[in-house]
Amino acid sequence: MTTTARVPILADSDAETVAVKAIAERWGLPFETTDNDVFQLWLTEGVLALHWLQSPQKMSPLVVDFHQGKAAYRAQNTQLKNEAIAKAVGVTGQFKPSVVDGTAGLGRDAFVLAGLGCNVQLIERHPVVAALLDNGLHRAQKEHDFIGDTCLRMQLIGTDNLFTGSGYTQEPDVVYLDPMYPKTGKQKAQVKKDMQMFQQLVGSDEDADTLLEPAIALAKYRVVVKRPNSAPFLAGREPNSQIKSKKHRFDVYIKRGFHESAN
């Protein structure tokens, strides 16, 4: 992963101070601002937002909100037959594999899998992104509706668990990876504003190839890697099968068939 930039967290009011300290302590974030800050996190009425202070164009703060936008619509209108990710992970009407999302990001793919009925444990290596995701999950989980119920099947467990192999509440059937991949030319122009901010903060996963082996070791049945159609195989390793969509493909590394004994 690209070196983490310094991003301070601030409270919008005195009432938020205790909560801000708890977030900062959990994710190792500083309180002090500097004149060189590129990003700042602000907690306002319980909502954590990332502000890009030096953005080339005016951008709204980045917030993880599972009740808004295309993610909410997609989760509520997902059909197994239309979801390439479901086919790759192995979701059926009768079988909902447990999943570890080792590169959770803003939680969007994990949210789709949870909407399909999977229990998903999330790992996000960037502490600022993890803090945003954690805040979004906790807010959503308080709501007694489909979105809230979906988010209850999502659990953010930490930042480095894929490499330590610890902290999981259950052994995952599937490990899912979607490492950041450098975009160039036309691809950059097509990236939406919220993802522009995300990519500026996180950069590309320069060590992405190192994720595959621990993922294979952890998964009970398979590892699924999401890649742009033009991208090479992760770690140069050819998958057992592929599921392709318009812009992406899902490379599937199979250890054994579902329900097949490990012995």
Swiss-Prot record:
Superkingdom as given in the UniProt entry: Bacteria
The protein's role, per its UniProt record: Specifically methylates the guanosine in position 1516 of 16S rRNA.
Family per record: Belongs to the methyltransferase superfamily. RsmJ family.
UniProt subcellular location: Cytoplasm
SUPFAM superfamilies: S-adenosyl-L-methionine-dependent methyltransferases
Reaction(s) catalysed by this chain's protein: guanosine(1516) in 16S rRNA + S-adenosyl-L-methionine = N(2)-methylguanosine(1516) in 16S rRNA + S-adenosyl-L-homocysteine + H(+)
Residues the entry annotates as binding S-adenosyl-L-methionine: 108-109, 124-125, 178
Top-level taxonomy: Bacteria, Pseudomonadati, Pseudomonadota, Gammaproteobacteria, Alteromonadales
Name listed for the protein in its UniProt record: Ribosomal RNA small subunit methyltransferase J
Enzyme Commission number: 2.1.1.242
GO cellular component term of the entry, any: cytoplasm
The species this protein was found in: Idiomarina loihiensis (strain ATCC BAA-735 / DSM 15497 / L2-TR)
The entry's keywords: Cytoplasm, Methyltransferase, rRNA processing, S-adenosyl-L-methionine, Transferase
InterPro entries per the UniProt record, alphabetical: 16SrRNA_methylTrfase_J, SAM-dependent_MTases_sf
Principal place of residence: cytoplasm
Keyword Transmembrane: no
